[in-house]
């Protein structure tokens, strides 16, 4: 349910604005309209939080070090020390990387002393280092004016030195000049490694502060939020400051009483058309299980749109079962849910909607898999446990089962899409002009007619023979949409003329409705693909498992485990791609849902 909101303006004396915001934050229900203004204290808070986050990112969970839960130390100074150490470590790591690169360049020519080369140079013996294409080196050997010595060939490159009484210029080769030799670099690397070890040891001693810094970052998140709201407060004639926002209508009286006690004023009003109103959704029961899904997708309905959580979860239950399609996978999900729940309960943490979602979807997969007799995609399971056969539904497993499942897919599609238009009808019939809602009756007629047409074209023309009445239902439905779809309360016939301007759009929308029904066949197709994958890996592993060779048996176990883990991962991905899509695209399009909302984020103090 989307909660009704009220617009609120809060006015206080400028000298008391900090105290007023503290009271407002303690109340914890007002969504503040942010202006993203700046202030010195806000900048400082953001900079301090950035230092804390940098320090936290440099620390590691260390099982050998007991993490401190509290400390009287200055956390910011500790964080700065960690960041400085981190910068020093990065600096030495860069030096090490540069030295290793230099060593790789020199090592091709072998170990030599630059001092010896300089001494030879003083005696007019010049040694130079070059590299060249292997084919070009052979040509270079034919030049009588060049005295060269091959050091090494690496792939298609020749590394060589030239020796002479003067410096030579070999234009077809690349010359290398070195500042250090291998001995110097190796000694330098040794020193750098020792310093790095010391620095890494020093920073590891700070790992005990990881929990404290994590809590301090959360604390600074609230400080930054408070400073941002403080900066956003607008001043009127220097004596008064005010801020605007939104509050749930159910909290209006409570807020009014709270601000009166605090000594500042509040003015309430209904939101206007152009206001960006936050969407506050209250969910209960099954609908609450949708929260983790919408949080992951980051989709929020607009304030004037509808909360589809309950319907979403009803149909998602069916979609999940048909896409996963394996009862054994459902049992695995159920066991994972139990383990996750126990881990939370043992730590004293409350269970979340996510835990309920796992159990809810597990049951879906178990039910559908049991009805189709699918357990790890293998008939051997049914042979080993004959009782499982009693759960099979003949409509889904015997003759014409494929056609029956496809029929179910299309029926689910027409049910969900029709539900969207029924919902639209009941909403529009309460609004003016009431006749606009008749277009939804037209849509219902179209969808039902198109549904029968889909059954005729895809399933069976003999089982679903086409009658003229079906075409007439579609035509009449399109006519109703055409006549009443653009009615806005002005002249009836002028609104019909507006429909002529969108006649192509109307045609495409009707075709889209046909395609939307067909798209529900993905429930069958994706489920069948998952069954085929599991069956294929089962077939591959059986000869290996029947072998008397232990190595082959182990290989068979690996094959079957890999196959089913892969299939579970692909099936879960399919649930997101296809199961969520049917709710968020096909259903939402027919409902007119644009998911254009912004989240309700009340200004409140977070519990530690």
Swiss-Prot record:
Gene Ontology BP terms: vacuolar acidification
Cellular component per GO, a single term: plasma membrane
Source organism: Borreliella burgdorferi (strain ATCC 35210 / DSM 4680 / CIP 102532 / B31)
Protein name: V-type ATP synthase subunit I
Lipid bilayer topology: Multi-pass membrane protein
Keywords annotated in UniProt: Cell membrane, Hydrogen ion transport, Ion transport, Membrane, Transmembrane, Transmembrane helix, Transport
Compartment list: Cell membrane
InterPro entries: V-ATPase_116kDa_su
């Amino acid at each position: 349910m989307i909660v009704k909101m009220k617009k609120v303006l809060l006015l206080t004396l400028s000298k008391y604005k900090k105290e007023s915001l503290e009271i407002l934050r303690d109340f914890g229900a007002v969504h503040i309209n942010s202006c993203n203004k700046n202030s010195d204290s806000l900048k400082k808070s953001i900079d301090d939080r950035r230092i804390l986050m940098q320090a936290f990112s440099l620390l590691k969970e260390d099982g050998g070090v007991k993490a401190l839960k509290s400390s009287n130390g200055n956390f910011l100074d500790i964080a700065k020390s960690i960041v400085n150490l981190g910068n020093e470590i990065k600096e030495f790591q860069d030096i090490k990387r540069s030295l290793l690169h230099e060593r790789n360049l020199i090592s091709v020519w072998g170990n030599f002393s630059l001092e010896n080369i300089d001494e030879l140079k003083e005696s007019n013996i010049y040694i130079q280092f070059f590299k060249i294409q292997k084919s070009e080196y052979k040509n270079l050997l034919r030049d009588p004016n060049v005295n060269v010595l091959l050091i090494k060939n690496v792939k298609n490159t020749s590394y060589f030195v030239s020796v002479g009484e003067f410096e030579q210029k070999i234009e077809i080769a690349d010359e290398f000049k070195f500042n250090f030799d291998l001995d110097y670099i190796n000694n330098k690397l040794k020193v750098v490694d020792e310093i790095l070890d010391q620095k890494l040891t020093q920073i590891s001693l700070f790992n005990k502060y990881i929990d404290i810094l994590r809590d301090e970052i959360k604390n600074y998140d609230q400080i930054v939020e408070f400073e941002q709201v403080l900066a956003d407060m607008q001043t009127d004639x220097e004596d008064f400051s005010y801020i605007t926002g939104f509050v749930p209508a159910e909290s209006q009286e409570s807020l009014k009483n709270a601000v009166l006690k605090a000594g500042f004023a509040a003015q309430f009003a209904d939101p206007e058309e152009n206001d960006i109103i936050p969407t506050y959704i209250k969910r209960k029961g099954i609908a609450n299980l949708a929260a983790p899904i919408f949080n992951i997708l980051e989709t929020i309905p607009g304030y004037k749109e509808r909360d589809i959580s309950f319907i979403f979860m009803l149909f998602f239950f069916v979609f999940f079962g048909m896409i996963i399609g394996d009862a054994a996978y459902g049992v695995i999900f159920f066991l994972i849910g139990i383990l996750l729940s126990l881990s939370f309960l043992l730590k004293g943490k409350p269970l979340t909607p996510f835990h309920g979602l796992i159990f809810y979807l597990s049951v879906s997969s178990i039910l559908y898999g049991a009805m189709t007799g699918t357990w790890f995609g293998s008939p051997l399971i049914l042979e080993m446990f004959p009782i499982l056969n009693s759960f099979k539904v003949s409509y889904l497993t015997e003759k014409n089962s494929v056609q029956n499942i496809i029929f179910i897919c299309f029926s689910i599609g027409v049910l969900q899409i029709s539900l969207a238009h029924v919902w639209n009808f009941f909403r529009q019939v309460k609004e003016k002009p009431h006749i606009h809602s008749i277009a939804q009756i037209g849509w219902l007629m179209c969808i039902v007619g198109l549904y029968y047409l889909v059954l005729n074209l895809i399933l069976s023309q003999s089982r679903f023979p086409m009658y003229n009445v079906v075409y007439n239902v579609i035509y009449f439905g399109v006519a109703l949409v055409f006549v009443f779809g653009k009615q806005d309360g002005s002249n009836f016939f002028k609104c019909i003329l507006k429909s002529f301007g969108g006649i192509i759009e109307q045609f495409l929308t009707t075709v889209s409705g046909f395609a939307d029904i067909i798209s529900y066949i993905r429930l069958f197709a994706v489920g069948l693909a998952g069954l085929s994958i599991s069956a294929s890996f089962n077939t591959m592993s059986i000869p290996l498992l029947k072998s008397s060779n232990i190595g082959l048996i182990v290989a068979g176990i690996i094959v079957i485990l890999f196959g089913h883990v892969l299939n579970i991962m692909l099936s879960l991905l399919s649930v997101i791609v296809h199961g969520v899509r049917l709710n968020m695209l096909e259903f939402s399009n027919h409902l007119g849902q644009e998911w254009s909302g912004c989240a309700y984020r009340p200004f409140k103090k977070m519990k530690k």
